[in-house]
Amino acid sequence: MSERVERNWSTGGWLLALCLAWLWTHLTLAALQPPTATVLVQQGTCEVIAAHRCCNRNRIEERSQTVKCSCFSGQVAGTTRAKPSCVDASIVLQRWWCQMEPCLPGEECKVLPDLSGWSCSSGHKVKTTKVTR
């Protein structure tokens, strides 16, 4: 009986040592990894950090982008002249999209009927933007 207890205790000790060695290895490897670069954005500005582009079966080009903004108090991320920017928060809260001047000069801005975004049109070309959260 005492031999069996010693054998089990010995196995438990080895398991504990193995787990501690595994943990130490992972912590050491994590410490050797270079730090992840953080993008600092100047207060009151926005920066595109990822952009995606594709076409659906109707030959309509779809684009999306991820933006990092550092806005002043009372401002939120928005769009001005087709570029990411900080805009007054009331524009976004009340969905008065065209007040942030999202279109390029010469384009006409119209809010979508369901207030989910806006469209910019010039001649026969129409660009529609839908806001997602």
From Swiss-Prot:
Expression sites (tissue/organ): Brain-specific.
Chief location category: secreted
Keywords, ordered alphabetically: Secreted, Signal
Pfam families hit by this protein: TAFA
Family: Belongs to the TAFA family.
Gene: TAFA3
Leader sequence residues: 1-30
UniProt subcellular location: Secreted
Name of the featured protein: Chemokine-like protein TAFA-3
Biological process (GO), any one: positive regulation of microglial cell activation
GO molecular function: receptor ligand activity
